[in-house]
């Protein structure tokens, strides 16, 4: 019984990841600004990478194979998901900040607290 629940929860997480990848691809081509495109790419990387890996780990735990193989494969999937969960937001933040500071991409904003802070630090 628990195997079926694990399998279907994992399958649904994998499907959610696929849907998020499609939504991110549509957003990436629809948005015109660098920062909103970067946001769409991050949603695709997190949603399309993290959730399917966790779902795959759950589906693996529900299989009828040797315990060592189950735990090894599930552990690799969960470790990869953890690396994605930590690395993608950090990389996206670094990319957005570098783009902002080099003034390569002009943000369309209503208020800019970061510019005020940076100008205050220069004076």
Where does each model-flagged region fall?
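Loop-to-helix transition at the N-terminal end of transmembrane alpha-helices
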Residues: 35-49
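Transmembrane helix-loop junctions in multi-pass membrane proteins
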Residues: 25-33, 60-65
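A generic, lipid-embedded transmembrane alpha helix
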Residues: 45-61
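Internal alpha-helical transmembrane segments of multi-pass membrane proteins, especially GPCRs
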Residues: 14, 39-43, 79
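Juxtamembrane loop-transmembrane helix junctions in multi-pass integral membrane proteins
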Residues: 1-5, 30, 36-39, 68
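Flexible extramembrane loops and terminal tails that flank transmembrane helices
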Residues: 2-8, 58-79, 84-123
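N-terminal signal-anchor/start-transfer transmembrane helix
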Residues: 11-30
